């Protein structure tokens, strides 16, 4: 028998994105036969009870081994940060992800934006070795513009935070949550 993996997948969601998140759940469950179980964690940005029920039903009707759990981040931490049509408060909540998962023993988690569709076995992405890196992510194609706007040196990288593999231990060791919040407090107008 092959060694099948249990996966921890995290998303942030508000009520407007519930249909997208449900589609993402189904796309993962239908396209990831090598996963023994998928544990979905949703950082809840004001989901209604009916939305949570719909998401639970989506998961249970598509897999006997998948679960969904809702997590609550302290939104007050992010209330004074720049919000636009491109960056919402919901987007900031992923920064709290490692602290929200402290009671679990995950070494690695996969973060996916709620509107992500998965068309292949997600285990392949989940198994990507991080090789002493805190996250695995894709450099944003608009990096040159973003670097200039954010005042980031060109040797640093601006990445798309919609798909990230996160080494929870390294994230915590390097105090990424605290450093990110500090950066946002000091550069919130960019």
Residue ranges and their predicted role:
Residues 1-190:
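Glycosyltransferase catalytic domains, chiefly GT-A lineage
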């Amino acid at each position: 028998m092959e060694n099948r993996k249990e996966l921890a997948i995290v998303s942030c969601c508000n009520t407007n994105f519930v249909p997208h998140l449900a589609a993402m759940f189904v796309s993962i469950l239908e396209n990831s036969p090598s996963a023994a179980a998928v544990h979905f964690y949703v950082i809840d940005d004001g989901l209604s009870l009916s939305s949570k029920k719909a998401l639970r039903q989506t998961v249970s009707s598509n897999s006997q081994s998948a679960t969904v759990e809702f997590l609550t981040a302290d939104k007050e931490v992010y209330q004074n940060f720049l919000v636009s049509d491109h960056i919402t408060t919901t987007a900031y909540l992923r920064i709290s992800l490692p602290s929200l998962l402290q009671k679990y023993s995950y070494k690695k988690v996969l973060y996916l934006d709620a509107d992500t569709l998965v068309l292949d076995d997600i285990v392949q992405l989940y198994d990507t070795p991080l090789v002493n890196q805190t996250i695995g992510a894709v450099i944003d194609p608009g990096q040159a513009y973003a670097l200039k706007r954010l005042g980031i040196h060109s040797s640093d990288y601006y990445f798309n935070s919609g798909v990230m593999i996160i080494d929870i231990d390294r994230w915590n060791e390097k105090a990424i949550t605290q450093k990110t919040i500090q950066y946002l407090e000091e550069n919130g107008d960019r």
